[in-house]
Curated annotation (Swiss-Prot):
Record-given protein name: Protein Jade-1
Species for this entry: Mus musculus
A single GO molecular function term of this UniProt record: histone H4K12 acetyltransferase activity
Source species taxonomy: Eukaryota, Metazoa, Chordata, Craniata, Vertebrata
Stretches for region Disordered: 1-46, 367-409, 589-621, 676-716, 738-819
Gene: Jade1
Region feature Interaction with KAT7/HBO1 and histones, mapped onto this chain: 61-81
Length: 834
């Protein structure tokens, strides 16, 4: 069913549009209506919203119609239809459009907004700034000098008289710069066109690499648009000929390098593998040691370092310069040298022969053999080489004429080109058009004509040279400077890399030195620990105090002395190594001496019964034997120490090998003296009472210090005289590690044999006829040695044993087996510790 509603205005439709209306809304609408009705000007509305039209369009649901005659409103927008249709009621109230003409305002400066217009890459992104390239282009490159300023002043006075506007300095600079730029561009174009046409249609033009004038399909002759060299595609490695202009490698990079193998500048050149050096392709082909990396691209030039020094030393016979690498004549027994490019310039015969195995051979001939090879071409290569020397004499008068013909033609061709270039330079003003310059700069033609005449005169005065440097040359110079900067940076990095390598080597050497020091300290610490253990064991076992003082002297023999004549650190290092070696030998010598004593005891047999009568004699003499070995070791150390001090006083420095020889010689002298004395004293008869009495005296001397010491006067020392003079020998510093190998470790079999020999000697209880070394305390021996050194100018002589010492040594011949085994253990410990 349709809903019946009263006609209402727009406000009524707004208030009654929905079924859920409230009292507050009606009250609000009534207030609003009353306010509108009470307006001072009662105007009719220009439009109303009519709902009757919508109501008339609605039909009852039971109305019979065809489905094609009506539409069913099923969308939520249905309620909006009930608000009515907007209908104008008073057309007179509609406002009429009115237009009036406004005066044109002056155009303001356009400010580019950041948001809508994007700036290009060359322009700065920030407002208020100018791009550096734009600023550089706007700056004039020509500056007025005093002559220009004076001419401008005179010209402005004439312009005032003529009623023309004055000319400022900036305008004059711009016009002169435009003249120079247009003259440079047009002249270069004319030169390239003129020379290009001349070379292209010249029948004598040849390839700069192979010197062949012929071109083939797929191997065209290409000309460089800048330096005008002509090369084949295959000769220069041009894979594809470009449609436009083509530049060679040197012109493309803007460099003018020198060839590494010849003195000629320019030409078809290719870089080496490093890219910093350049070589002519023809030089690389004709010099046998040089090769090319990629034959397709004909670059880079490689194996330049394989050229022998003999080739670098050759002097060119054509230019008389010792530069680069020259080649020699291919004729047998002819050694004439010349550069490849010099041979091409002089027109020498240079042949390229293709062998059967697709190998290319290059044959070059000197001026002497190039003149007569043309009539002999049919004879073959061998005949020409054999008959080259004798047949060259009759044709020698024709040689200068034949060699001058190509030179004259080349000189004529070069002179013609130079004349053309000079003519173009003299007519430089023809390459500038006044009308074009006036239009480009928006200046009057009269002003431009004044400046044009002044520009011609000034350039004529300057010998037709340009007033400003061309922009392209400036760019090339800038690029060259940048390249030089990069090259210097590369050199800096190379030197830095070398310095870092040196630092790395130094750190490695310092680390290795410190490791060696640490190993030396560890070994010294182990030796010191082992000596300490031995001292403790000797104290526990009850060794006399003289033995402990001997060991202390052994341990602290190389303590640095404080005084003006103190030895250096290097001498102390040598002493430590020397004493280690002496300690090892001295520990072995008492064992050998005991063998000899046992042998003498077995042979004599006079004291056998006394040893059986004294059952505790071997036990008592056990400590005496140990003290004997230690005292002999102490004496060896004292002698070596005095010898070194004497050498330091005299300023003699002996190398390691010399010290070892002196040590052996000293030991041999001691052994010889001992043998002689033992032979003399073996004939003296010994009584048992004397032996026992001497044994008791020796025991008291060993147990109580200072009682058994012999007087200095009783000791006899024979000092050998030295007839030679002392010579200072340069010392060779040796590593302390190498001087440790002074010990000789006996094998197991030798140690067992020594033990058995000592056991047999103790059981036989024979007499001892071998005399030992002096057993005086360390202090007395040191004093006597110092006196001997002062008397003999620093030499340490071998001392002879007195009779009392020989008699005391006879009492120490009988030993027990336990003493021998214990001494063997001490020797083993000292060897292991070292």
């Amino acid at each position: 069913m349709k809903r019946g509603r009263l006609p209402s205005s727009s406000e009524d439709s707004d208030d009654n549009g929905s079924l859920s209306t409230t009292w507050s809304q009606h009250s609000r609408s009534q207030h609003g209506r009353s306010s509108t009705c009470s307006r001072p000007e009662d105007r009719k509305p220009s439009e109303v919203f009519r709902t009757d039209l919508i109501t008339a369009m609605k039909l009852h649901d039971s109305y019979q119609l065809n489905p094609d005659d009506y539409y069913v409103l099923a969308d939520p927008w249905r309620q909006e239809w009930e608000k009515g249709v907007q209908v104008p009621v008073s057309p007179g109230t509609i406002p009429q459009p009115v237009a009036r003409v406004v005066s044109e305002e002056k155009s303001l400066m356009f400010i580019r907004p950041k948001k809508y217009i994007a700036s290009s890459g060359s322009e700065p992104p920030a407002l208020g700034y100018v791009d550096i390239r734009t600023l550089a282009d706007s700056v004039c490159r020509y500056d007025l000098n005093d002559m220009d300023a004076a001419w401008l002043e005179v010209t402005n006075e004439e312009f005032k008289e003529m009623g023309m506007p004055e000319l400022d300095e900036y305008t004059m600079e711009r016009v002169l710069e435009e003249f120079e730029q247009r003259c440079y561009d047009n002249m270069n174009h004319a030169i390239e066109t003129e020379e290009g046409l001349g070379i292209e249609y010249d029948e004598d033009v040849v390839c700069d690499v192979c010197q062949s004038p012929d071109g083939e399909d797929g191997n065209e002759m290409v000309f460089c648009d800048k330096c005008n060299i002509c090369v084949h595609q295959a000769c220069y490695g041009i894979l594809k000929v470009p449609e436009g202009s083509w530049l060679c490698r040197t012109c493309a990079l803007g460099v003018q390098p020198k060839c590494l193998l010849c003195p000629k500048k320019g030409g078809a050149m290719k870089p080496t593998r490093s890219g910093t050096k350049w070589v002519h392709v023809s030089c690389a082909l004709w010099i046998p040691e040089v090769s090319i990396g990629s034959p397709e691209k004909m670059e880079p030039i490689t194996k330049v370092s394989h050229i022998p020094s003999s080739r670098w030393a050759l002097v060119c016979s054509l230019c008389n310069e010792k530069f680069g690498a020259s080649i020699q004549c291919s004729v047998k027994n002819c050694r004439t040298a010349f550069h490849v490019t010099c041979a091409f310039d002089r027109g020498l015969e240079m042949k390229t022969i293709l062998a059967e195995n697709d190998e290319v051979k290059f044959k070059s001939y000197c001026p002497k053999h190039s003149s007569h090879r043309k009539p002999e071409e049919g004879l073959g290569e061998g005949a020409a080489q054999e008959n080259g020397a004798p047949e060259s004499s009759p044709q020698s008068p024709l040689e200068p004429y034949g060699s001058l013909e190509p030179n004259r033609e080349e000189a004529h061709r070069v002179s013609v080109r130079k004349q053309k270039l000079q003519q173009l330079e003299d007519e430089f003003y023809t390459f500038v058009n006044l009308l074009d310059v006036a239009r480009a700069l928006r200046l009057p033609e009269e002003v431009v004509d004044f400046l044009y005449q002044y520009w011609k005169l000034k350039r004529k005065i300057n010998f037709n040279k340009p007033l400003i440097t061309p922009k392209k040359d400036e760019e090339d110079n800038l690029a060259k400077r940048e390249q030089d900067v990069l090259f210097r940076r590369l050199q800096l990095f190379t030197h830095l890399r070398q310095d870092l390598e040196r630092v790395r080597n130094l750190t490695y050497m310092v680390t290795r030195r410190e490791k060696i020091k640490r190993s030396v300290c560890k070994v010294q610490e182990q030796i010191f620990t082992q000596y300490t253990k031995l001292l403790e064991q000797e104290k526990v076992s009850g060794v006399p105090s003289s033995c402990s003082s001997a060991l202390e002297n052994m341990l602290f023999f190389n303590s640095p002395s404080v005084g003006p004549n103190a030895p250096k650190i290097e001498d102390l290092k040598w002493h430590s190594a020397f004493f280690r070696k002496q300690m090892g030998t001295s520990l072995v010598h008492p064992l050998k001496k005991s063998h000899k004593r046992d042998a003498v005891q077995n042979s004599s047999g006079t004291e056998g019964k006394t040893s059986h009568k004294q059952p505790g004699l071997c036990g008592r003499r056990e400590g005496l034997e140990v003290s004997e070995s230690l005292l002999s070791l102490e004496k060896t150390f004292a002698e070596a120490r005095l010898l070194s001090s004497a050498q330091q006083k005299n300023g003699v420095v002996t190398p390691d090998h010399g010290k070892r020889r002196d040590n052996r010689f000293h030991c041999d002298l001691v052994k010889g003296d001992l043998k002689d004395k033992s032979f003399k004293q073996s004939h003296k008869p010994l009584r048992s009472t004397d032996t026992s009495q001497r044994h008791l005296d020796n025991t008291r001397a060993a147990t109580s210090p200072g009682v058994g010491q012999s007087a200095p006067g009783t000791r006899k020392e024979i000092v050998p005289k030295c007839n030679g003079s002392l010579v200072k020998v340069p010392i060779t510093p040796a590593s302390p590690v190498k001087s440790w190998g002074g010990f000789r470790i006996p094998k197991k079999g030798e140690r067992q044999q020594q033990g058995e020999a000592h056991d047999g000697a103790c059981h036989q209880h024979s007499d001892c006829s071998h005399l030992g070394v002096s057993r005086a305390p360390a202090k007395e021996r040191a004093k006597s040695r110092l006196r001997a050194d002062s008397e003999n100018d620093g030499y340490a002589p071998d001392g002879e044993m007195s009779d009392s010492e020989s008699e005391a040594s006879e009492k120490k011949c009988i030993h027990a087996s336990s003493t021998i085994s214990r001494r063997t253990d001490i020797i083993r410990r000292s060897i292991l510790a070292s």
